[in-house]
């Protein structure tokens, strides 16, 4: 499997199961997808044809019930419908990594479904160790633009950006809210 960043704003998500796992998976899509619908067991059609029809109306299917056999049935129907599907109890055709978003910075960590707690731990360790990641992204973007006007060599520009990235003083300034790209650039050019 590979990581992709996907625009889901036009996609509809159907989640079977409204427990903790279903709620967590719904939260993953809630702010981005066109629609997120969660069904509890009592609201799920028992007739296979009706279930097939319901699944065909959605783009992404999540089987998040505590019943492995039911989840298998849902993912089989989703597969027959050529849908993206994920299961809480088996392998789907996509995974939901542990994610962090802030500004233009996004981080996704996965253990391919084998140890989700490890993925969450790594995500939390990185984001707590570097609280100014989003600010560094903003600074690097600004510096790239400024450097293109001052330094013709792409190799030299890349070296300067790496020096800034590895400068503990710059990270500290970013954490304190000081983002003066021109002043930082003067240190390196």
Role assignments for model-derived ranges:
Residues 1-45:
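Hydrophobic, well-ordered beta-alpha structural blocks that scaffold small-molecule cofactor pockets
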Residues 10, 56-57:
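Alpha-helix C-terminal capping/helix-to-coil transition sites in glycosyltransferase folds
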Residues 40-56, 64:
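Glycine-rich, highly charged phosphate/nucleotide-binding loops
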Residues 58-68, 105-114, 126-128:
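Short beta-strand and adjoining strand-loop segment in the mid-core
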Residues 60-65, 71-96:
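ADP-ribose/adenylate-binding Rossmann-like module
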Residues 94-104:
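Glycine-rich, charge-decorated loop segments at or immediately adjacent to ligand/cofactor-binding or catalytic sites
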Residues 113-189:
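An accessory alpha-helical subdomain
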């Amino acid at each position: 499997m590979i990581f992709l960043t996907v625009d889901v704003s036009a996609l509809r998500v159907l989640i079977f199961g409204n427990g903790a796992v279903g709620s967590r998976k719904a939260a993953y899509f809630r702010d981005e997808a066109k629609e997120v619908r969660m069904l509890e067991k009592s609201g799920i059609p028992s007739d296979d044809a009706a279930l097939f029809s319901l699944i065909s109306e959605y783009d992404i299917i999540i089987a998040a019930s505590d019943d492995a056999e039911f989840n298998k049935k849902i993912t089989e129907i989703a597969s027959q419908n050529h849908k993206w599907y994920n299961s809480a109890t088996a392998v789907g055709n996509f995974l939901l990594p542990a994610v962090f978003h802030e500004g233009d910075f996004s981080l996704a960590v996965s253990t391919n479904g084998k140890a989700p707690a490890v993925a969450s731990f790594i995500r939390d360790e990185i984001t707590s160790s570097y609280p100014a990641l989003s600010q560094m992204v903003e600074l690097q973007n600004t510096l790239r633009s400024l450097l293109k006007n001052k330094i013709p060599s792409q190799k030299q520009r890349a070296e300067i950006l790496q020096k800034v990235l590895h400068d503990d003083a710059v990270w500290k300034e970013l954490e304190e809210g000081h983002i003066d790209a021109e002043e930082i650039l003067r240190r390196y050019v």
